Every structure is written in C-alpha cells, then in structure tokens.
C-alpha cells in the first residue's frame, strides 16, 4: 500500500499601497531579494538626477521635474524623501507574522553612515491585519557640521472584507540635521595647494 503524500499548504503573501484621497489600492511587492540592495543606502535612490547636500539622510530635490511629487501642505517635508507619505506606506497580508529587517552601513570612523529598517506585519485572521515599523538613519557626513539623525515610526492596520475595506496608518518622525553653510572657497576642492601653502592633501572635516 503506497503511503499518502503529505500536502503542504502555501500561505500567499500580498502587499499594496493606497492613493490619496480616495484610498484606491495598488498592488505592490514584498522585497526580500537583495538585488541592488546597496541602492537603498545612497542619497540618489530617489532618482538618477537627484541633487542633495551631499550627506545621506539630508535634504534634496529630484531634478526631473515631472517625477517630483505634488507639493504638500507642510512644504518643509517635500525635500526630505525619507518622510513617509500615504502613497509610500505598504500594507501587507502575510497570513503569518512577518518581519523584514534591513541594515546598511558605510564610511569610516569620521564619515560613517548607518540605516536600520524594520517592518512587521501580522494577521488576526484572513481579513484583519496589523503592522508597524521603524526607520533610523545616522550619518556623520563628509564635511564638518554636516551630521544628521533621522528617526521615523509607523503603525498601521487594514481590513479587507467581502463588502468593506479599511486601510489606516499613523506615522511620526524626528529629523535632526546640521547645516554647515557650504565651503568658503572652492579651491579647497579644485586646487588645494593654492590655499594651503602648497599642501595638496585635504582633510574634508577641516575645510572652512
């Protein structure tokens, strides 16, 4: 008598985002493959034509006009792509508890940068889901008085029934950025010997 084959049940996981103001659902992805993973930890992850102050986690602007997001009511956050907005928030339905952790680091002792992402999602049943996450960025910068520390958190939930759907989330952030005002003389970069009495090597942290 042949032994019966054991059936394995595959739990299908889905992800989606919603649009403003009607909350229309758009299918999204659950990124667990480290393809181009490094691109998440550079300032130019926003766009190939991105202009920033040179430090990860600081302000910047997409130079492709038609790819820019619409101006928000609080315009100070428009130049901070790390701030979570409604279209950026992902809802998950994983069936089982799921945690996605990402950590990236680079630089040396004086110019290190770190980013930690944690996303959690768990289901009460097939229709009701809860999620939470944090995003922490700490970067010292390449120049003096350029360090920043960004911390953001979010908590969300969704209900997908036969007749009704509800998606909601709450988020907050605390961003601390130093501003050095720029370099006083471009020759510290283009021709350092002229402004340093013949010395060609430059310590970025000492440039006035």
For each feature predicted by the language model, list its residue ranges:
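Outer-membrane beta-barrel translocator/channel fold
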Residues: 48-49, 141-150, 156-208
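Short strand-turn segments of transmembrane beta-barrel domains in outer membranes
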Residues: 71-81, 85-120, 141-142
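Outer-membrane beta-barrel channels and translocator barrels
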Residues: 94, 125, 160-164
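Surface-exposed extracellular loop regions of Gram-negative outer-membrane beta-barrel proteins
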Residues: 114-154
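Cleavable N-terminal export/targeting peptides
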Residues: 1-25, 180, 187
């Amino acid at each position: 008598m042949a032994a019966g084959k054991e059936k394995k049940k595959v739990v299908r996981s889905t992800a989606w985002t919603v649009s403003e103001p009607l909350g229309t659902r758009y299918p999204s992805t659950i990124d667990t493959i480290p393809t181009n993973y490094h691109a998440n930890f550079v300032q130019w992850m926003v766009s190939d034509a991105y202009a920033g102050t040179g430090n990860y986690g600081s302000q910047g602007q997409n130079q492709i006009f038609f790819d820019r997001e619409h101006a928000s009511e609080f315009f100070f956050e428009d130049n901070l792509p790390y701030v979570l907005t409604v279209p950026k928030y992902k809802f998950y339905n994983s069936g089982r508890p799921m945690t996605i952790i990402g950590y990236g680091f680079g630089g040396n002792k004086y110019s290190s940068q770190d980013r930690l992402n944690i996303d959690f999602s768990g289901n009460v049943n097939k229709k009701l889901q809860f999620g939470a996450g944090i995003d922490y960025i700490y970067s010292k910068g390449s120049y003096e008085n350029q360090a920043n520390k960004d911390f953001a958190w979010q908590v969300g939930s969704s209900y997908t029934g036969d007749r009704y759907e509800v998606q909601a989330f709450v988020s907050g952030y605390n961003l601390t950025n130093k501003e050095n005002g720029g370099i006083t003389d471009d020759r510290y970069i283009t021709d350092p010997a002229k402004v340093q009495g013949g010395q060609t090597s430059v310590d970025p942290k000492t440039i006035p």
